[in-house]
Amino acid sequence: MLAAHKEMRAKMAAMRSADGNGAQGQGAPPAGSGRSSGQGSGQGSGQGAGPRSIFTTLKGGLQQLIDALEGRLNPQWIRKSTSVDGLERDRDGWRLRTGERGEFYDAVILASPAWAAGKLLAATDAALADELSAIPYSSSITVNLVFDESQLGPLPDGFGFLVPAVEGRAMLACTFVHRKFVGRTPVGKAVLRAFLGGAKNEALLDQSDEVLVATVRRELSEILGARIIGPHIPAEATQVSRWRRAMAQYAVGHQERMKRVKEHMSALQGLRLAGNAYDGIGIPDCIRTGRQAARELVAEKQSVTAGR
């Protein structure tokens, strides 16, 4: 964990050196380019001038990333809403089972959560499956509240706040979305996104949307003040999303576990793992592990073909 912490500090330092506050290191345009990509404002709806945000995202939401990837693939290669029920070695490749169908592939990249990969590999390598299934995951809930900004009192400066665990609240953090990402909300609207759940509060997942919204409204009023965002201020819209077992936890001993996983994987030709459970939790890490897995499989296939 210490090594991971040092690596993260090194990445942040490199980002800061690229553009002073890390914005350009995150893919934001250079200052004065006239383009906005995740730039934020410390005041109002983030529409005017203000300090640049270190946070970046796609203007149309992260679904753009998936849509772009899908658009570059042959539609016949894509199977949506299809459950993979089994994966087993078959001659020089792998047989993947979806319902009653079985399909043969030269190589497979498992980009699923580690616990799902563990289930699929149980019959192939029980020890590997146990290692993957033992990687802990936590869940998350987001509660989005939309307000008429003129109805709210003055929010604190910045893009949101964290809630210390010692306070014993359901909320973990809150983001002022209208400040964090330019263009994400209409002018005059304020969107507050609260985060709940975590490894120690999984029970919240089973609460109703109404209860979760009421909990967030109450805690926001207590933290920010009733005059700023009290229960008397109506929300124009609410949205609750639950993300079950979505966030891999890099517990003590994770690096040692990864060494054991790699040892097992080295014996399974034509199979690789990718995703946020192994060597980095961010989107760039997922992209990196996916590319690395693809390159390794191509090189492996070429090596086998050349040896025949």
Question: Where are the predicted features?
Answer:
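General small-molecule cofactor/ligand-binding pocket signal
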Residues: 79, 236-239, 272
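FAD-binding beta-loop-beta segment adjacent to the flavin cofactor pocket
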Residues: 182-187, 242-273
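Short glycine-/acidic-enriched loop or helix-start segments at secondary-structure transitions
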Residues: 119-121, 249-250, 283-284
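Active-site/ligand-binding neighborhood in enzyme catalytic cores
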Residues: 1-94, 104, 111
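Internal hydrophobic alpha-helix adjacent to the cofactor/substrate pocket in enzyme cavities
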Residues: 286-304
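Mid-domain catalytic core of redox enzymes
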Residues: 80-210, 218-224, 263, 307-308
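Short, basic, low-complexity termini and linkers enriched in Ser/Thr/Gly/Pro
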Residues: 23-31, 231, 299-308
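Short FAD-binding loop at a beta-strand-to-alpha-helix junction that anchors the flavin cofactor
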Residues: 192-193, 262-281, 286-289
